[in-house]
Amino acid sequence: QYYYADLELPAAEYEIRDALHKLRDFGQTDGFFEISVLNCELLPALAEVRLDSPTLDEMNFFAKRLEALNEEEQLVFRAVSRRILPKNPEGELVSMKDLINCTYGLDQVMIASNVGSDEQLGQFVIDNDLHEDVASIPDNALYLLDKKQIGKLQRESDGGVFVDGHYVVTGDYTMPEIYDGKTFPDEAPTEWFAFRLEVAEAPVNSADETAGSAEWISLPIDKKEA
């Protein structure tokens, strides 16, 4: 019999512990947990693939990395992650190490906005003189050019892909090995607490009287901060 607990990532340490405690309360005490992705808004394909023995810590770190990406980096990630995800969901396992490392170096990839097809890319190439042969053609003859074919050749040369109306030049992207599969890169520590209390001055008549002075505190707390 299987027991499971849903956990939305990234999660705080106490949330992860609560999820694990739920499994143990149901009798799942052998230390073996199978982890699968139910939904990933940024990369829906993750719900269809098989991950190569991911740990909960890896999944949480990966979720933190995705959450930290800006809009352009998200577009690039969706483009370059296609190298990692198999075309056949039933195929090879997907490495968590590669997924994590694929969230780095994204700011080095060129993006062209409002370019979502080969024809639009061809026009972009013409307008910006990106190809020497095209740039040498007189302006009065540009209308004769096959924009779609020019865009197709440029895309194939760049190894580029279209993502949500953007052209992402992924051919020059080299995935850095920031995560070695054992030790996570340095990151800012997150606050841990067993529980939180909202503390305020004692009211005289109504609780609303002191609502403005209320503050949240996390327990346990260091004596110096108390």
Where do the model's predicted regions map?
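Long, charge-dense low-complexity segments
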Residues: 1-226
